[in-house]
Amino acid sequence: MFSSINQLPNRIPPSDRPDPKAAQALQEGLGGQFGEMRTMMQYLFQNMNFRGEAKAYQDLLRSIATEEMGHVELVSNTINMLLEGASSPMPSDFHDSQLPLSVALDSPNIHHFLVAGQSSRPVDAAGNPWSATYVYDSGNLVLNMLYNLMLEATGRLQKCRLYQMSNNKAFRATVSYLIVRDLAHEKVFAKALETLGVNWNKALPVPKLDTSGMPEVKELESINLHNQQWTFTDESSGLSKIFNGSSPFDDGGELEAIDGVPEGAPIPNLPDAPQEFASGLDGELKKLTQQIQQMETTTISSSSSTTASRKK
């Protein structure tokens, strides 16, 4: 089972401007062959189908699979932020000469507007649907680890290319975070393969790059984010049995296996978009949802008070 935390793994700063083109490029990092949906599903299935007694490797897979769920959420929310404000508000006296969604005709992906109500979709940058055929699980531990390393390396390569396509702050923040986390995951799988007899020497990481020209990436590396992996569980994990000691790459890093989950960041709250008929709630329906929200707030407050009383 999995538990849900209503936060994102990294903060998304406000977008500089509506940017449907950057949103479309980032779709590759979500639903592409080497995107976050692929890594999430591949590691989940390798975890669920794991055979044998080498459970530390299964714990490793489970921790990264769980992290990738948060990456899917992060990229989806970033795409939404990049699309926010791209269309015009719905005029109060709408008539034929006013077309609040005309921007969709010039957008690189009309489905962002026509199908998804100005939101992300499970597709790549060319609009191709995400495919289950991307998922690799041979049942062989060494083969799976090798393939996962290749997946992380290719994903990082593509994100380094994405970094150079847009300087939009929201876009850059998420892409930079994923560049650093993909490097950490390269190290996780490389270290796992080291314990299985592989000597990497100087072959990795992929790509080899000087991040001094990427200030957002450099800032995250300065807090050792590229050498850390969380267990994403409150229970005992064998992750630290594998992910420890020196980095498997020739970079002088020291690896950290950390219990629990990373500190999160707020999830952006998208406003209603009447021109998209989203959320589509009229006055009466809004009153009903506000009542539900008030009930939820009261319940949470009551629960917190009860817990505090018990502690006394």
Regions found by a protein language model. Name each.
Residues 1-312:
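Non-heme di-metal
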